[in-house]
Amino acid sequence: MTQPPITKESQALLSSLAAQRDHVLGILEGLSEEDLRRPILPSRWTCAGLVHHLAIDVERFWFRAVVAGEPMPDEEPDNAWQVPADVTAAAVLDAYRRETELADAIIAATALDSPPAWWPEDLFGSWRLADLREILLHVIAETACHAGHLDAARELIDGRQWVVLTE
């Protein structure tokens, strides 16, 4: 099987996705298990829970299931925002890294204009992303949004900021 060519467009999309993934992991560096599992905002999500959601509902779902057509395991939690008590935050971060590596392999083997191998019509109805290009844009936007959520949580935990604004 030949790999699709790397174009300026695909390189730009992959660079943007990599930057957002690095942001997610980078803003959490140095936090303790307790901090990663502690709800910070009134909605009660945790940093570990958000990364678990990104691993399962974003990376695994969009790339392995939708793009590659791999079935989602039956044991996947209905609420990926909740990390089981017996799973450490470090294990959640490792799972996210693994899912991004698996996703990258799928992306590298798929042309940008390839349609999804599977589409969950029961979830989305008539709404549909047409190809890998649109799926990448969707995942970049969702990951960036959640990276911003993690920025706010981190600043509330210990004052650290990913981007420091000056006057």
Residue positions per predicted region:
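Short, contiguous alpha-helical
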Residues: T2-Q3, S10, L14-E29, E33-A80, ...
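Acidic/histidine-rich alpha-helical segments that form the ligand environment
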Residues: A80-P120, D131-A144
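Active-site rim elements
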Residues: K8-L13, A89-L93
